[in-house]
């Protein structure tokens, strides 16, 4: 299907907007992937906030010109799917996880922070925990000393409470003896 000039410009503008917001771009060759598998990949990407696009490479090159992803322009050849994500690791995770189960999806390259990533770089980026997981781990680390302090205080309180009960029990017979002697 051929696009006229205004349609091409609309695609370029849309992808330029994606590239301006995104932190990461991952490119993968999708030759031989079934429609069902591609639909599954797009669904997984949507859940993670990743925008996947199949674009003409010429339009993709024009769209990323002047952005941090321009470093990938010379690698934009062949049937590629482009994954843009605002989260630094989301696009790499989605594509790498899908490529593990489907050998027809082949990671070609990626870009993060203006640097080109090779296949291994994309896989390493995919292994980094997401922002939400890292924040949860940080909260756990910050809460750990507080939790330990609370546990120690509870244990001391329980020991002290047991000591008070023992003293009270010991004082009761003494009080009974004193009352009997007074009577």
Swiss-Prot record:
One of its GO terms (molecular function) is structural constituent of ribosome. The keyword Ribonucleoprotein applies. GO terms for cellular component: large ribosomal subunit. Keywords: Ribonucleoprotein, Ribosomal protein, RNA-binding, rRNA-binding. GO terms for biological process: translation. The keyword Cell division does not apply. PROSITE patterns: RIBOSOMAL_L10. NCBIfam families: PRK00099.1-1. Part of the ribosomal stalk of the 50S ribosomal subunit. The N-terminus interacts with L11 and the large rRNA to form the base of the stalk. The C-terminus forms an elongated spine to which L12 dimers bind in a sequential fashion forming a multimeric L10(L12)X complex. Forms part of the ribosomal stalk, playing a central role in the interaction of the ribosome with GTP-bound translation factors. Belongs to the universal ribosomal protein uL10 family. This is Large ribosomal subunit protein uL10.
């Amino acid at each position: 299907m051929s696009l006229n000039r205004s349609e091409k410009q609309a695609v370029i503008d849309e992808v330029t907007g994606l590239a301006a917001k995104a932190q990461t771009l991952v490119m993968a060759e999708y030759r031989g992937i079934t429609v069902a598998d591609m639909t599954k990949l797009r669904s997984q990407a949507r859940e993670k906030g990743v925008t996947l696009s199949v674009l003409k490479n010429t339009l993709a090159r024009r769209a990323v010109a002047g952005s941090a992803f321009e470093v990938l322009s010379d690698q934009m050849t062949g049937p590629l799917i482009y994954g843009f994500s605002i989260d630094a690791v989301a696009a790499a995770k989605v594509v790498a996880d899908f490529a593990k189960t489907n050998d027809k999806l082949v990671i070609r390259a990626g870009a993060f922070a203006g640097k080109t990533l090779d296949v291994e770089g994309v896989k390493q980026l995919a292994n980094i925990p997401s922002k939400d997981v890292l924040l949860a781990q940080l909260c756990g680390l910050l809460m750990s000393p507080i939790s330990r302090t609370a546990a120690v205080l509870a244990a001391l309180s329980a020991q002290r409470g047991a000591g008070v009960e023992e003293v009270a029990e010991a004082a009761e017979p003494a009080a009974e003896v004193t009352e009997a002697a007074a009577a």
